[in-house]
Every structure is written in structure tokens, then in C-alpha cells.
Amino acid sequence: MAAASSFTAAAKFLAPVSARSAGDYKPPLPLPASASLRPGRKPAPRLRTALAVSSDVLPGNKAAPAAAAHSAVTREEALELYEDMVLGRIFEDMCAQMYYRGKMFGFVHLYNGQEAVSTGFIKLLNQADCVVSTYRDHVHALSKGVPARSVMAELFGKATGCCRGQGGSMHMFSEPHNLLGGFAFIGEGIPVATGAAFAAKYRHEVLKQSSPDGLDVTLAFFGDGTCNNGQFFECLNMAQLWKLPIVFVVENNLWAIGMSHLRATSDPEIYKKGPAFGMPGVHVDGMDVLKVREVAKEAIERARRGEGPTLVECETYRFRGHSLADPDELRRPDEKSHYAARDPITALKKYIIEQNLATESELKSIEKKIDDVVEEAVEFADASPLPPRSQLLENVFSDPKGFGIGPDGKYRCEDPLFTQGTAQV
């Protein structure tokens, strides 16, 4: 059906030069003997890998894009990818409707346009593998198997939500699905993901709780803006030092709220930061689910074999503003139309039909099925009860100074403004 992928055939994570900057590449200097930690100890060889599988976004890129051929996918795999991406898109569109109708509160960040990244990575995971997300986490939860009705109920703040209504849009957790969060502040989730990967390695090597597939893998999702934070660099260092089974997935949608990625970092090619820590750095077209899947498969299998972490930069684009409160006035119309024409769902649909993996009517039936799933999720969330007042106190371990918190779950406070503020709780 298709030739071996450019990633697998040309690299296998071993290419020592970036396809996007081959003319500027200089081999790293050997480590001086004085850098050895112990007298007489030879420094360990460093893996210096930076590979661009494709490129589209960054200006000034003169390198030819990677071959368009995809690795073969079966009919079942293609339809699974399509269904998951359509679920993410339709679910997020419904979230926008419900938000503007006053059914959701606070900030709501949608994932439209980035579905190829979530689907391409998460659908390759086992149940025991972990996902750590950001504030843009609804679709990651859906891809990991959290039911749409549980995610929608959480967005509605209902007791039937995956966090019993206490997490909301930016804090999706599900213990049964090993979804370890949504984290509202950028970079917060990366140390959690690194810790989860350490726990997986400890279980495997120390407790001998191994699975036949190898190590459990953790995916850490974060955006381009996070890559200028200290936690990012600290965790890359620790993960490579201990060869942790983790994949760092950068969803580079080119904008950190209203700040262009090209104005926020000294080197906009994030994947090149991987080799600085001795781990592979890979760039992939995040608007193409099949290319993402190729790279994800190799990175996940590499982690599962105990060969350590990988940094993957997925260049993608969000089709809506930063949040539903963002009028999206800073991005140029021609930029938005360029990426709208590269819609990852439309591209996959075209591929499936051209490869005779399914008919258009079969794909329409999937879309109808997902419409029904999302409609049912809204009905379920709307009919679900609000959390009881006493639930607020379940995880409060001390009485805040100045307030009395009774065992009946009701606040008592001398300050009438506080009482007014919590009257509707």
C-alpha cells in the first residue's frame, strides 16, 4: 500500500543530522577528559539525534519535506483513527455550544485542529500506560478511553463527571484510565509524568512487576510555550539520566496564548533540544495523523524496551482562539486559512477513500454514530445531579484560619462577605 515510512527507513532514531538544517550541522565536539565524573573514567558516548520527518510551519525552511508515503494501516486501524478524531472534533464543537449557553463555567480551551496528535499517540497505548495532559485536555481524555458522558458531565460540574464535578475543564483525571491530569498551569504536568515513568521503571526493575509487553509508558503532552520553562529542561535531564519510559510530546500550535512561537524562543525548532540531553529529538507534521502515528509508534516502543525517552515536536494548529473567551484577533486570516485547508480529519478521510479502506457512506455512518454519542453525553450531563455541598470538605485536612468548618459540611464564618460568596455552593 505504501513504502516504509521516512522515519523508519531513513532514521530509526539514528540519523545524526536534522533534515531541516543539514547545511548548518556541525558534529558535536568530543567530551574533554576533564569532564569525567571520576578519575580515569571514560565519558559515556552521547546519542546526538535530531530528525525532521516533515516540515511546513516555520519560515525559511529550505529542506525538502519528507516523502508523503505512509506506512500501511489496516482498515480497522484507519477507522479507529477516524472515529477517535471525529469524536474529538464533534465533542469540542458541542462544548462551545454548551459554554455559550451557560452550561459550563470558567475557562474552556478547545482542541479543534490538533486531533491528529492526540489520536496518533494515545491510540497506540495499552490500558496500563499513562497520559499527562494540559488545560487543553478534553480530547486526550476521550482518546484514552474516558467515556464522553463522563467528560461532558465534568465540564458541566456534575457529580457524575470523571472528577465528580470538582476538576472542570482544565483538570481531567481518571484513575481507571491512567489519565493523570489536566494541569492548568503550563509545565505542571511534566514532573508528574516524569514521576509516573520513574514509578513504571521501579515496578519493572525493582519490584519485578513486569508485563509481557515491557515497561509501561507515559506520554507527557505540553505546548510550545512550556518549552521555555525550567521544569521542561529539568525533567528532560532526569528522564534521560535514568532512561525513563516516557515520551515528551510537544504540541506546537505556534501560539502561546497571544505570543507567537517565533517571537518567544531563541531557537524555534524545539525538537533540537532533545539531543542536548542525549535523547532523540524528532519533528513531525502534526496535521497528519499517519505521520504522527509512525513517529509515536517508534518512540513508544523504544520507551517500552527500556531505551529511554524521546522528545517529539508535533507542528500543529488550533482552529479556535486560545480559549472560548479569546476573540482570536491576533492571528492573521491567511495563516488561519492555510491551516484550515490542512484539516487533519479531512486529510485522513481523503486517504481512507483513496486507499479503498472504506466508502464515504461508511465514514458518514461513523460521523452519525459520534453525533449520537455526543448528544447523549449532553443529555446525561444535563440530567445529572450537582455534587453535594459536603463534597467540598472531603479532601480538606485542616480548618483554615478564621473559618469554622463544621462536620455537617456547612461553612460558618464571621465575615458576611464570605458567607455571601458561598451562598450558592
Swiss-Prot record:
Mg(2+) binds at D224, N253. It holds the Pfam family E1_dh. Residues 1-66 form a transit peptide. Pyruvate binds at H109, Y135, R136, A184, I186, D224, G225, N253. It catalyses: N(6)-[(R)-lipoyl]-L-lysyl-[protein] + pyruvate + H(+) = N(6)-[(R)-S(8)-acetyldihydrolipoyl]-L-lysyl-[protein] + CO2. The keyword Metal-binding applies. Keywords: Chloroplast, Magnesium, Metal-binding, Oxidoreductase, Plastid, Pyruvate, Thiamine pyrophosphate, Transit peptide. The keyword Transit peptide applies. One of its GO terms (cellular component) is chloroplast. Its cofactor is thiamine diphosphate; Mg(2+). Its EC number is 1.2.4.1. Tetramer of 2 alpha and 2 beta subunits. This is Pyruvate dehydrogenase E1 component subunit alpha-3, chloroplastic. It comes from Oryza sativa subsp. japonica.
